[in-house]
Amino acid sequence: MITDIKKRALHRARILEGQLRGVEKMIDDEAYCVDIITQTLAIQKSLRSLNKLLVENHLRTHVTEMFDEGGSRRDDALDELLTVFELENRA
């Protein structure tokens, strides 16, 4: 994994961990539902941010290598890109 992206992804994952603990506490404390929903929507945004970093890393490393190899590896890279695109559109 690219060092800078890894650092940013770990930072984002740690933020998410804290946000999830916060939601758990809010539920346990029976916080106002809209406040909990607001926090869960923030978590979804954070997850999208993490996913963007992971996709960027994959494109800059694995996909680039697969394209450079050519042939069936290039086709595999395209298949992976389509899969990621489809997964993103389902979310």
Q: Which sequence ranges carry the predicted segments?
A:
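Solvent-exposed interaction patches of small proteins and small membrane subunits
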Residues: 1-91
